[in-house]
Amino acid sequence: MHFNNFLSNKTRNHSFSKSKIDNLNSIPFSKDDYKILESPITFRETLLKLINNAKSRICINALYLQHDEAGIEILNAIAQAIKNNPNLYVRIYVDFHRAQRGLCGKGPQIGNNVWYQQFAKENNLSLNIFGVPVKKREIFGVLHLKGFVIDNTVLYSGASINNVYLQKFDRYRIDRYH
């Protein structure tokens, strides 16, 4: 059965026509304007290079910025970028609940939020890291966006910032969505 048979008449009447789609706001780009990064190592290296060369802004959305070697590497790069350019616009958005804790199953740990505060104090920085509470309890939903805007470059990813997703060592998590 064709999908349209499941739609109500009201829905069908409000569907997008080609002319409506053509009139939506957009940013045109060609195939030469984007690149697919095919490995987590390439992604991490590209992210670090962009951060190190940032001139105007660094905006990061991630489920979490983990207090591990990869997270430290990224946060150190951001701190250095701020020191090199004090007028750099930096905003990092992470899930509120994930920032309150460390890794599950690793025993007692300080939350990532405490690490962010300690890092900022030790480096004499004003870091804008925001915990976004999507729901009142983590079990009901989290901020799961993963996007990076550095100057005029946009990186989309399925990776949060930690050792496993950025393949800091020999381990890498391959998600089932491929």
Regions found by a protein language model. Name each.
Residues 6-53, 66-178:
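HKD-type phospholipase D/PLD-like phosphodiesterase module
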Residues 1-3:
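Non-Sec secretion/translocation targeting segments of pathogen effectors
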